[in-house]
């Protein structure tokens, strides 16, 4: 990803009739993006901690963050920063949907599929409203020299999937067709989550801050959304996976390989490893 280009922050907070600049105008655009990102990271993490204590309080906190991002994005004069804040709405939306749709009413595989549909729609709505090309969010033509890296990340899913199983130890899923369940996991967790985080969010983040700051921030947001698994080790693991996938996405400019790898990790975690115990 690239550092901020051609998106100099417009004057924010200028008082009409006086020419006096607001305090925000003295902050470099890249630093302002970092401050905004860290603020929302903190709020999302706080909402996740509250969810662990009481799901009703947690979902209320996520709803607050959702509306805060929507309102904040409309009040921000810098176009790139506004787009970044708008895309952050996807993080609380994911948790609102997952918390409000309990597993007791659906099998886990069906749950993954149902959750992914509104997330997929919301992500593409952001892409459309922001006028982003599909190639900018990872749907670009693979470059020949990047294919080894694109394909090389896929087999890493096997040890990573077993490693996450050792952390979480999920129960075996009820009987499902292995093929259909695998396809759902690849598309509904792999593709949708990679499009959301390494596609849209990473693209917007690296336009308002440096490449590495954007990668670290999105990896951290991805990690804190795993707080509900009640494992600090899993949050660290999720950060590592997110960081790894972000680097591959940055080098290859696509999300094909990491989407398959992400899906395979979940196939190992939920379908393969539990049956081997």
Residue ranges and their predicted role:
Residues 192, 203-204:
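Membrane-interfacial catalytic/cofactor-binding modules of polytopic membrane enzymes
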Residues 191, 208, 212-277:
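Functionally important transmembrane alpha-helices
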Residues 134, 198, 202, 242-246:
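Interfacial helix-capping/hinge residues at the ends of transmembrane alpha-helices
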Residues 190-198:
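Acidic (Asp/Glu-rich) catalytic motifs at the cytosolic membrane interface
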Residues 40-49, 89-101, 156-165, 219-227, ...:
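Aromatic-anchored segments of alpha-helical transmembrane domains
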Residues 1-130, 274-277:
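N-terminal, membrane-interfacial amphipathic/helix-forming hydrophobic leader that caps
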């Amino acid at each position: 990803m690239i550092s901020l280009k051609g998106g100099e922050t417009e004057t924010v907070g200028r008082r009409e009739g006086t020419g006096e600049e607001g305090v925000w105008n003295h902050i470099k655009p890249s630093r302002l993006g970092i401050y905004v990102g860290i603020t929302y990271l903190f709020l999302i993490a706080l909402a996740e901690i509250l969810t662990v204590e009481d799901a009703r309080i947690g979902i209320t906190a996520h709803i607050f963050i959702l509306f805060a991002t929507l309102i904040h994005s409309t009040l921000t004069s810098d176009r790139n920063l506004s787009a970044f804040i708008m895309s952050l709405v996807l993080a609380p939306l994911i948790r609102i949907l997952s918390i409000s749709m309990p597993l007791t009413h659906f099998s886990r595989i069906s749950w993954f599929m149902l959750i992914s549909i509104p997330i997929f729609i919301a992500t593409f709505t952001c892409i459309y409203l922001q006028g982003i090309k599909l190639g900018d969010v990872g749907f670009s033509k693979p470059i020949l020299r990047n294919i080894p890296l694109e394909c090389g990340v896929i087999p890493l899913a096997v040890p990573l999937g077993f490693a996450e199983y050792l952390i979480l130890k999920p129960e075996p899923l009820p009987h499902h067709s292995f093929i259909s369940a695998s396809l759902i996991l690849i598309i509904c967790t792999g593709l949708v989550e990679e499009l959301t985080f390494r596609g849209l969010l990473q693209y917007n983040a690296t336009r308002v801050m440096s490449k590495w700051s954007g990668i670290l921030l999105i990896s951290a947001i991805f990690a804190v959304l795993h707080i509900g698994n009640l494992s600090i080790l899993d949050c660290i693991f999720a950060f590592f996976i997110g960081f790894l996938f972000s680097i591959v996405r940055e080098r290859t400019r696509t999300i094909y390989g990491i989407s398959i790898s992400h899906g395979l990790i979940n196939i190992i975690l939920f379908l393969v490893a539990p049956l081997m115990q």
